[in-house]
A protein has these predicted regions:
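Membrane-helix interface segments
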Residues: 10, 75-76, 92-96
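Active-site scaffold of zinc-dependent metalloenzymes
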Residues: 49-74
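Catalytic Zn2+-binding segment of zinc metalloproteases
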Residues: 84-102
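Metalloprotease/metallohydrolase-associated module, dominated by Zn2+-dependent proteases
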Residues: 2-44, 56-59, 98-141
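Short alpha-helical catalytic segment bearing the HExxH-like zincin motif
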Residues: 75-87
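Short amphipathic alpha-helical surface micro-motifs
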Residues: 34, 50-52, 82
C-alpha cells in the first residue's frame, strides 16, 4: 500500500512539473515536428535520465523543458551536460523560462553570429549560459 502511494505521489509530481513547464513542452513539440521534416535520422540518446536528449544534425543545442535537441559534434557530451543545466532552469522558472532564458539566449547567440566582435567574449559568460553551467556542475554527474 505504501509503495502504491509513493508511485501515485511521483506521478502527481511529474504531472505538476509537466504543466509548470507547459510552454516549453509546446514549443518543443513544434520544434520536434520541424526537425522530423528536416532531418533524416532522429533518435533518442538514452544515456541521460534527466531529460529526453535528441541528437540531430544542427549547430549547437536547444533545450525546451525536458527536451534537449543537440548537434552531434566533438563537444557533444560537454554540450549535453550544459544543456541539462538549462533543464534545471526550466524546472525552476516554469512558464518564465522562455522569457528569462530562452529568448535572451537565442538572441545573444544570433547577435554573436551577426557581429563577429561579440565573439571575442566567452559565450558562457552570458548570464543564461553561466547559470546553466553552474547548475550542471552542481547537480549533474
Amino acid at each position: 500500500m505504501f509503495e502504491m502511494m509513493k508511485l501515485i505521489i511521483k506521478y502527481i509530481k511529474n504531472l505538476i512539473l509537466f504543466i509548470w513547464q507547459l510552454p516549453q513542452h509546446i514549443v518543443a513539440l513544434i520544434y520536434f515536428g520541424y526537425l522530423v521534416m528536416m532531418c533524416k535520422d532522429l533518435g533518442i540518446d538514452s544515456r541521460y535520465k534527466q531529460a529526453i536528449v535528441i541528437p540531430c544534425v544542427m549547430r549547437g543545442a536547444v533545450t525546451l523543458g525536458n527536451y534537449v535537441f543537440a548537434g552531434l559534434n566533438s563537444e557533444y557530451k560537454k554540450t549535453i551536460k550544459h544543456e541539462l543545466g538549462h533543464t534545471i532552469q526550466s524546472k525552476i522558472l516554469g512558464p518564465l523560462y522562455l522569457i528569462v532564458i530562452g529568448i535572451p539566449s537565442i538572441t545573444y547567440c544570433g547577435l554573436r553570429r551577426a557581429f563577429p566582435s561579440l565573439r571575442k567574449k566567452n559565450y558562457y559568460n552570458f548570464y543564461t549560459e553561466r547559470w546553466a553551467n553552474n547548475l550542471s556542475e552542481k547537480y549533474i554527474k
